[in-house]
Each structure stands twice: as C-alpha cells, then as structure tokens.
C-alpha cells in the first residue's frame, strides 16, 4: 500500500497498517526518508527473535552501516513507534535497517525501489551472517576474520 505523509492512500488496496505510527515516526524524524518498508523476512527474523544485532558482512549491505536490534516493544504500540523515532533521530543516514525485537525488520530509504532493494540485500546478508556464525561456532575455518569494507559504502 502506498500512502502519503498525511496518511492518504495513493495506490493499492486495503486499509492502512496497524503499524502506521511506526512508519510515521521514521518519516517525521528524517525528511530524506520517502519510503518505509516493514517485513517479517525469514533469515532476518532469526536475529530479531533472538534480540541480536546482525553482523553486516556482505558487500551489498555495507551502505546500511550497523544493523541494530531495537529493544522490545509490543507490535502496533506507541512505544514501538517511539523506539523507531529515537533511532532514526540518532542516525540520519539512509538507507538504514533496523531489527525489531521479536517482531520483524524495518528498512528506510529514499525511494520504494532502493528501499526494497535494501530489504532484499538485508535478507541475503542475514542468511550469510547466520551461516557464518554457525560455521564459526563449529570451528570451520578458511575465511579471514571480518574485514571492514572501505568501498561501496554510499548510494
């Protein structure tokens, strides 16, 4: 569903999400944000459900910086919207992704296309990070420790 910042439906069918307050909090805190996508992506949910920040290890997600898991707040509540508002206020960079503890993911960006692309990249990174952590725990070696990327970090 596509809505404007006054909550008018622009395109699509159905009603406005119960999570509208969370979406609006992001828009209100950063004028560069023109798209907010909330999802329950399978691999990303592993990190969100466990309350873990996601290691940002794939080249395709470097421009998102830290992938932080926010403290728990029940879905659809003003408390969750305020946690999102606080994080967006503290870090104005876009694109940006947040894990919502025990709930899902939130990706903010400049356009629908770029934000959806970042959601797909986030999910790919989640799969890679999950497998990396499993391999590391099993003592499977052969890959260097994570190295900071110094390229492909901006739009």
Tell me the role of every PLM-derived stretch:
Residues 1-155:
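Glycine-rich flexible loops
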């Amino acid at each position: 569903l596509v809505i404007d910042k006054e909550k008018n439906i622009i395109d699509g069918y159905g009603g406005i999400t119960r999570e509208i307050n969370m979406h609006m909090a992001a828009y209100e805190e950063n004028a560069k944000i023109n798209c907010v996508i909330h999802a329950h992506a399978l691999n990303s949910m592993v990190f969100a459900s466990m309350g873990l920040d996601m290691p940002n290890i794939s080249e395709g997600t470097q421009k998102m910086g830290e992938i932080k898991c926010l403290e728990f707040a029940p879905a659809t509540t003003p408390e969750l919207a305020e946690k999102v508002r606080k994080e967006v206020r503290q870090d104005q960079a876009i694109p940006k992704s947040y894990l919502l503890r025990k709930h899902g993911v939130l990706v903010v960006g400049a356009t629908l296309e770029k934000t959806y692309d970042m959601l797909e990249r986030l999910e790919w990174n989640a799969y890679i990070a999950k497998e990396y952590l499993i391999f590391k725990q099993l003592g499977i070696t052969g890959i260097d420790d994570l190295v900071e990327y110094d390229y492909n970090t901006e739009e």
